[in-house]
């Protein structure tokens, strides 16, 4: 339990920040799931549209420190490769 006023304030700030981070992470995962569902359905047009929507969302999460920049880039790259493979 926080004893000082500043510690209590930090507890409030951390709770607020945690909620924001949780929301951003969830939003990113939702976009990734939509891409994976489109890939599973085999429709390249839908998968490409979903990927184009997901990429900025993933990079935004990386910018805010939700995931590491390299992690987001790797996921985008792997999803793009899977979408490209649908055309073949």
Curated annotation (Swiss-Prot):
Record's keyword annotation contains Ribonucleoprotein: yes
Biological-process GO terms, alphabetical: translation
Pfam family, one: Ribosomal_S20p
Record GO cellular component, one term: small ribosomal subunit
An MF annotation (GO) of this entry: structural constituent of ribosome
Keyword field: Ribonucleoprotein, Ribosomal protein, RNA-binding, rRNA-binding
UniProt-listed SUPFAM superfamilies: Ribosomal protein S20 (SSF46992)
Entries under InterPro entries matching the protein: Ribosomal_bS20, Ribosomal_bS20_sf
Region (Disordered): 1-27
Function noted in UniProt: Binds directly to 16S ribosomal RNA.
Family stated for the protein in its record: Belongs to the bacterial ribosomal protein bS20 family.
Protein known as: Small ribosomal subunit protein bS20
High-level lineage: Bacteria, Pseudomonadati, Pseudomonadota, Alphaproteobacteria, Hyphomicrobiales
Gene label: rpsT
